[in-house]
């Protein structure tokens, strides 16, 4: 029996079951006759327009409300003080002070906005559908805008004018539930949390720092060069922009023209919160063009630029100012280059032309083109005329890519910086920094989001001091790499000339000729041009400082460099959406899966199923001959199933579902029993009224209006519960639920009683209705009847039904209804998808078809029916999405992990560890070990199936990936891999689940960050996080279809072995029986001795090599064994491992993978024998080794760099445990350290209870880390927090001591 036998019904969870709907009888004919589909299709299109209209209203509201927000000067000044201190010192306390300063301002703004009357209606039905006799806020605003002659919608808008907008909004009167999700999304716009799309974030996180930087520049400029700006001319030219209503410094309310000094008063930042204020401020900085005038009216930046040229002082450019970001949802907030969905070829070429014309016409604040600006910037950078301490590289994959590109080694820059920073922080303790020093080093290296160019320059200079001349990595080579950027612009310009001819060819609207094979050359030309532009952006990306990340670091930047660079970068960044839209257009599928919601003239369709609500929600469920049906009543005939109709039409045929629900007992019971019309019937006593008035029956409830809240009284609570019990027994409907309540004295709170009511306040019964009556109302168009359908209900269905079918059937099963596990929920939805491709028979019935799966022993199949490719898109389809609750009566899963750990502590001796690794030769590999670490089972998940047929998914996915990779590069149609992946994963998850139950196993994965998961293997094989998520969700509610319906593991008693999934970040290191252990040192570790390579030999120079080899205790030739031995203590190389002393040997051979010039530089493999390599090397340099004595001194006495380069290479070969041969499945592990019997582990000769290859070794050692956790769980003291963190030294000690 499984130890998890009682881990059932632990918590409830919700699922949405999805089915097709098949119209019955005259249903489809009647629907079309009434135009119901057309009505809902129009409503779906109008909904998109309505969202645009509501966004316009949000713009208006934001503009209006922010014009009256006033952030106190004290708060602004405090923010400023901390901000500038933080630029000088990255102190943790200052970071906290800065966060506090931000949060205080955000809170003040948020409270002001939320207190406004208009805000209260922004997200409820009153925005669109006001109370009777009143006009909604939205309608009123539209009418006022029309009366005031305000033009809300531009010429190219989807909405013609305000009259159309009014008609659209009025059409949603009574349909406001449509906007529930949209309103939730728009609430983020007003959030005070760190959400970049919030107006408060835009003010405090984005624009306030920019304003403060500009203020500081203005004050410095006035001090250094007061004559640079013509103040009087600006005041004259930009009088409109300098006019403000309020001077927040003096609190003067008087519309007047401000001086520049007043513009930069910190209190007057309040004038630049909304878009009109931002536009004014930006114009003051950048100037403006005025119709009819030949010259531009200069802003501050132009004056700085002119003065800098006049006195020939480029240093003044640092005073140029940055414009503020546009306010969220403003017309100008979105990028200037807006790309809609591309509908035809004309859209493609027109959009491309617009993009390149805009790039060519774009001018920076210096009135220069993008090419000219970047050329000058990078020329100055190459000449190192800029302050390198204030220019940064992004410290991510961009930096390692740059290192590879410039130095042909991805690790050079990172290694140089690490060594340099370590030397700065721990000069006396380089090999073994203290914990505090390690934290500081990490903060300035791998954890730093940006590295200054000065740091990189100094690091490389220091790095080169210890490297041979031909191994030098010069900083200048990095700068030269960017100086070549103008050449890329020239190449783009050449290819852009071809675009004109292509545009002419494809300018006709409505055509999709670019999707045809004949357009392949033109598609390639388009792609080449976009690729070049995209590559340019990627090259520049390393300099780009993300706005949100800058807030965390408060980088001290070269303001002029970033001012003009970011202008260019953001303009070029429009290539990303353009590229994606055009690629998606070219590679689009021939069919569309777009669907829209059906309402059948009822805004509350299927909102609930309660019998009393049937006339309102007009949706009813039926069962007939083990098939399920959904009926939708015509809105005008919504009483065709009232009690009278049911009574008159009883008979054989259909069973109608009668649904009764007592929802929200805490609100429903008092609402009913104390309502004005019912209070006499339920007749509460004076004592009960007293209890209710003062809320003494609740701990935190509210008293009735006009009464004071008295302290909770348990006796009053129980009196109130007895009143509720008596009243329920009187209620005409609720008395039939058959409530079985606990003894009143057992309740300790009113909430306990409410929970009992809700758990029993759900009831499904059935009424028989004659088939003739149903047929009659369908034929008359009073009822639209659909069969609820999936493949399990097909006459051709074979095998077991899927879980959604089992769940659906369980809803109506008497065994479920006796003690409810599955509950049917409201909020169901119906959808419609139109046919998008013609129906064409791919394989006629009764004709043999070759099986695609080469692993299938049956080579051909014959079907009794025609096969049609993508058949589901060749027909109009109806769909039904229905939510349900599983484990309806169960409570939450607050301490689920603790419960699991307590069980494992009690049953530790019966538990196995199932560890899963993501392999290089395996999609996934598992190892099952017992409580002593012995391997019980191990195998690959490459091949899944049964004895009749197994499928090699590794090969199938690899083949598809290869095709997809080629198609992606050439913009060809991409084969769908998603369904195969999910089919594969569902089978893997099922196999894991079986092992878990059979062996009482916990599951262990490596805790890899998302980037590592995405980057370690080919992208298309990145099934692992999906595997983890699918496994978690499977173990949320684990049903084995073979198990009996009401037995453990069956539909009614599913295992629950993981906590509900939210996000991987929130999940931490455990979710139920799944644990995450640190990644690293799992596949490249000796499974017998526990040896891991932490030497990492690397040739840099003769002196460094001499120093390195001198640290070995002994280097000699073993005369008895015939191989070389290197003895050392890790402590001499830095304290990195639990066991210090090791002897590694040149035993055996290794496989080296390399680019073979004789094979067109493709990957190839050669076998090398380290012992022979060393023998030859030592002989070549006349070093005697045959005596068996230590030769360390002779080695360190050499001075030839070729000698040490080769010796280092051979030592790396000896340390190479993992060996794989290109193009084959060969992937073995060989250890350089002998065990106590003098044997070297080699997975090719390993017994079945040891890892069989390198991937198996990875899974095995993940399992050993899991075994460590199991030991901690077993020994954990009650009440003490379980430590799930495994440090490397703890892990090394564990594995190295296991076999000793």
From Swiss-Prot:
Site (Binds crRNA alone and in crRNA-target DNA heteroduplex): 16
Site positions per UniProt: Stabilizes transition state for pre-crRNA processing: 852
Site (Binds target strand DNA): 131
Stretch list, region Binds single-strand non-target DNA: 692-704
Site description Binds crRNA in crRNA-target DNA heteroduplex, residues in chain: 295
Region feature (RuvC-II): 972-1078
Region Binds crRNA in crRNA-target DNA heteroduplex, annotated ranges: 326-329, 538-541
Practical uses of the protein: This class of CRISPR enzymes recognize a 5' T-rich protospacer adjacent motif (PAM, TTN for this specific enzyme), unlike Cas9 enzymes which recognize 3' G-rich PAMs, thus this enzyme increases the possibilites for genome editing. The simplicity of the Cas12a-crRNA directed DNA endonuclease activity has been used to target and modify DNA sequences in rice and tobacco.
Consequence the record notes for mutating residue 1006 to Q: Complete loss of DNA cleavage, still binds crRNA
Active-site residues annotated for this sequence: 843, 852, 869, 917, 1006, 1255
Renumbered residue ranges of the record's region Recognition domain 2: 340-591
Subunit structure: Might be a homodimer. Might be a monomer.
Family in the record: Belongs to the CRISPR-associated endonuclease Cas12a family.
Name used for this protein in its record: CRISPR-associated endonuclease Cas12a
Annotated source species: Francisella tularensis subsp. novicida (strain U112)
Lineage: Bacteria, Pseudomonadati, Pseudomonadota, Gammaproteobacteria, Thiotrichales
Gene that encodes it: cas12a
């Amino acid at each position: 029996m499984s130890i998890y036998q009682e881990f059932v019904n632990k918590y409830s969870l919700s699922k949405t079951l999805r089915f097709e709907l098949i119209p019955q009888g005259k249903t489809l004919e009647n629907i079309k006759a009434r135009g119901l589909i057309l009505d809902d299709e129009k409503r779906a299109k109008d909904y998109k327009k309505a969202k645009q209209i509501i966004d316009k209203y949000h713009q208006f509201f934001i503009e209006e409300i922010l014009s009256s927000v006033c952030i106190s000067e004290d708060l602004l000044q405090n923010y400023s003080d901390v901000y500038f201190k933080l630029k000088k010192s990255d102190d943790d306390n200052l970071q906290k002070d800065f966060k506090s300063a931000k949060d205080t301002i955000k809170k003040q703004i948020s409270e002001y906005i939320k207190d406004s009357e208009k805000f209260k209606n922004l997200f409820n039905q009153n925005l669109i559908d006001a109370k009777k006799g009143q006009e909604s806020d939205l309608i009123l605003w539209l009418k006022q805008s029309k009366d005031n002659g305000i033009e809300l919608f531009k010429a190219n808008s989807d909405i013609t004018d305000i009259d159309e907008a009014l008609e659209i909004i009025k059409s949603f009167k009574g349909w406001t539930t449509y906007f529930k999700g949209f309103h939730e999304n728009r609430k983020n716009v007003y959030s005070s949390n760190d959400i970049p799309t919030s107006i408060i974030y835009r003010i405090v996180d984005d624009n306030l720092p920019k304003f403060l930087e500009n203020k500081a520049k203005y004050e410095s400029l006035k001090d250094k060069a007061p004559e640079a700006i013509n103040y009087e001319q600006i005041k004259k030219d930009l009088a409109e922009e300098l006019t403000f209503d309020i001077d927040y410094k003096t609190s003067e309310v008087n519309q007047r023209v401000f001086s520049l000094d007043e513009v930069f008063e910190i209190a007057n930042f309040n004038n630049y919160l909304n878009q009109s204020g931002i536009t004014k401020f930006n114009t003051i900085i950048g100037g403006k063009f005025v119709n009819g005038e030949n010259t531009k009216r200069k802003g501050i930046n132009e004056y700085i630029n002119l003065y800098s040229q006049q006195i020939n002082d480029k240093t003044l450019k640092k005073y140029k100012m940055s414009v503020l970001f546009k306010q969220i949802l403003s017309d100008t907030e979105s990028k200037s280059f807006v790309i809609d969905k591309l509908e035809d070829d004309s859209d493609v070429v027109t959009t491309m032309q617009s993009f390149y014309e805009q790039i060519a016409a774009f001018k920076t604040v210096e009135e220069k083109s993008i090419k000219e600006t970047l050329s000058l910037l990078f020329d100055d950078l190459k000449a190192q005329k800029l302050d390198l301490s204030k220019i940064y590289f992004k410290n991510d994959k961009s930096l390692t890519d740059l290192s590879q590109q410039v130095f042909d080694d991805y690790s050079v820059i990172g290694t140089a910086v690490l060594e340099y920073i370590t030397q700065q922080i721990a000069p006396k303790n380089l090999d073994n920094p203290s914990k505090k020093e390690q934290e500081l080093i990490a903060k300035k290296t791998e954890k730093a989001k940006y590295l200054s160019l000065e740091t990189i320059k100094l690091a490389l200079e220091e790095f080169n001091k210890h490297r041979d001349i031909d191994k030098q990595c010069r900083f200048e080579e990095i700068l030269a790499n960017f100086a070549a950027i103008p050449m890329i612009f020239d190449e783009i310009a050449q290819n852009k000339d071809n675009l004109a001819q292509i545009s002419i060819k494809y300018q006709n609207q409505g055509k999709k000729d670019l999707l045809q094979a004949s357009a392949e050359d033109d598609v390639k030309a388009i792609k080449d041009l976009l690729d070049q532009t995209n590559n340019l952006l990627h090259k520049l990306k390393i300099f780009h400082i993300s706005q949100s990340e800058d807030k965390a670091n408060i980088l001290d930047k070269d303001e002029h460099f970033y001012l003009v660079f970011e202008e260019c970068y953001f303009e070029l960044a429009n290539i990303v959406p353009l590229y994606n839209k055009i690629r998606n257009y070219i590679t689009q599928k021939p069919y569309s899966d777009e669907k829209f919601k059906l309402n059948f003239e009822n805004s509350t369709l299927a909102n609930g199923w309660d019998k009393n609500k049937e006339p309102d929600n007009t949706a009813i469920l039926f069962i007939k001959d083990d098939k399920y049906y959904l009926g939708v009543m015509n809105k005008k005939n919504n009483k065709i199933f009232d009690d009278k109709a049911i009574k008159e039409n009883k008979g054989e045929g259909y069973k109608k579902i009668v649904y009764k629900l007592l929802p929200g007992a805490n609100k429903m019971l008092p609402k009913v029993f104390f309502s004005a019309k019912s209070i006499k019937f339920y007749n509460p006593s004076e004592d009960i009224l007293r209890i209710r008035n003062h809320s003494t029956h609740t701990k935190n409830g509210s008293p009735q209006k006009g009464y004071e809240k008295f302290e909770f009284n348990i006796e009053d609570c129980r009196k109130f519960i007895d009143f509720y019990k008596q009243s329920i027994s009187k209620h005409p409907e609720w008395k039939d639920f058959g409530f079985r309540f606990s003894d009143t004295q057992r309740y300790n709170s009113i909430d306990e009683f409410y929970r009992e009511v809700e758990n029993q306040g759900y009831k499904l019964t059935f009424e028989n209705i004659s088939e003739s009556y149903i047929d009659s109302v369908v034929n008359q168009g009073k009822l639209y009847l659909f069969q609820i359908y999936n493949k399990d209900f097909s006459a051709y269905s074979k095998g077991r039904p899927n879980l959604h079918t089992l769940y659906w059937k369980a809803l109506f099963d008497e065994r479920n209804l006796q003690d409810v596990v599955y509950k049917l929920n409201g909020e169901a939805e119906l959808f419609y998808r139109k046919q998008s491709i013609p129906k064409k028979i791919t394989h006629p019935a009764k004709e043999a078809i070759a099986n695609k799966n080469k692993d299938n022993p049956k080579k051909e199949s014959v079907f009794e029916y025609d096969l049609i490719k993508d058949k589901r898109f060749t027909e109009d389809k109806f769909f039904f999405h229905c939510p349900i609750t599983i484990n309806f009566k169960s409570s939450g899963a607050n301490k689920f992990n603790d419960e699991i750990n307590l069980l494992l502590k009690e049953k530790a001796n019966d538990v196995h560890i199932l560890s899963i690794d993501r392999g290089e030769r395996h999609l996934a590999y598992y190892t099952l070990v017992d409580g002593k670490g012995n391997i019980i089972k191990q195998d690959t998940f490459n091949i899944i199936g049964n004895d009749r047929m197994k499928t090699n998914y590794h090969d199938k996915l690899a083949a598809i990936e290869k095709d997809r990779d080629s198609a992606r590069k050439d913009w060809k149609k991409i084969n769908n891999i998603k369904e195969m992946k999910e089919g594969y994963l569902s089978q893997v998850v099922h196999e894991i689940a079986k092992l878990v139950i059979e062996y009482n196993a916990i599951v262990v994965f490596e805790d890899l960050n998302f980037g590592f998961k995405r980057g370690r293997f080919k992208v298309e094989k990145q099934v692992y996080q999906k595997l983890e998520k699918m496994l978690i969700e499977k173990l949320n509610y684990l049903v084995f279809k073979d198990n009996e319906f009401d037995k453990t593991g069956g539909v009614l008693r599913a295992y629950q072995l993981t906590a509900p999934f939210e996000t991987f970040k929130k999940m931490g290191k455990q979710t139920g029986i799944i644990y995450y252990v640190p990644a690293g040192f799992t596949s490249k570790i000796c499974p017998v001795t526990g040896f891991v390579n932490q030497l990492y030999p690397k040739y840099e120079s003769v002196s460094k090599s001499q120093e390195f080899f001198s640290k070995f205790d002994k280097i000699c030739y073993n005369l008895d064994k015939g191989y070389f031995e290197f003895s050392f203590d890790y402590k001499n190389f830095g304290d990195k491992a639990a066991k210090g002393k090791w002897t590694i040997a040149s035993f055996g051979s290794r496989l080296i993978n390399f680019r073979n010039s004789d094979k067109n530089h493709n990957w190839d493999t050669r076998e090398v024998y380290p012992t022979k390599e060393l023998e030859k090397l030592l002989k070549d340099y006349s070093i005697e080794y045959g005596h068996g004595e230590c030769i360390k001194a002779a080695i360190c006495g050499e001075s030839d760099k070729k000698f040490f380069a080769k010796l280092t290479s051979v030592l790396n070969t000896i340390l190479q445990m993992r060996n794989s041969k290109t193009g084959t499945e060969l992937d073995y592990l060989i250890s350089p350290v002998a065990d106590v019997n003098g044997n070297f582990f080699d997975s090719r000769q390993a017994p079945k209870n040891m890892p069989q290859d390198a991937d198996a070794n990875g899974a095995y050692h993940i399992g050993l880390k899991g075994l460590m956790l199991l030991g901690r769980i077993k020994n954990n003291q009650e009440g003490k927090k379980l430590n799930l963190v495994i440090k490397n030294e703890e892990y090394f000690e564990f594995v190295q001591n296991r076999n000793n």
